[in-house]
Amino acid sequence: MDGVRLTEIVEKMNLKNLTPGVDITERKVHVPDVNRPALQLTGFFDHFDLNRVQIIGNVECAYLETLTRERKDEIYEKLLAHKVPCIVFSNDLQPESEFIETAEKNDIPVLGTCKKTSSFMGELIRWLNVKLAPCISIHGVLVDVYGVGVLIMGESGIGKSEAALELIKRGHRLVTDDVVEI
């Protein structure tokens, strides 16, 4: 798969779009990993993976509260200049209006969730791992034989379905016939 649309993530994870002025319809997430940008909020951007969804929780917000207005604006500019897929505020945290303005200026979607940071991260990572998993289609028959998946493959017309039918008659289970997605 070439990515998961951000609109699908927003719908599946029940996220609020805090930047309605930013178009999220064509934006995609291509990696199942996420990042909490704590180090980036201090100004350290070495090895920053900008392909990941960025999640800001209580710790990051508490750190931002200690900064002066000028330093916050500088950090917002640096963080949001990177073209990350989106930034999610967890724990029902509300970003400052300056953060939203800078995000809209840089065309970065800012989303919100009421879920706890760790719970949201785990749920999102698990879901993205499934959605972004590689998948191939094979012509054949998949049968469950004593709890083990058996894939019967071969040229068209050689009796794959008939072999599966004989296994089914003996109490085994058909999983899929004709096209098997792995």
Predicted regions and their residues:
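Walker A/P-loop NTP-binding active-site region of P-loop NTPases
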Residues: 175-182
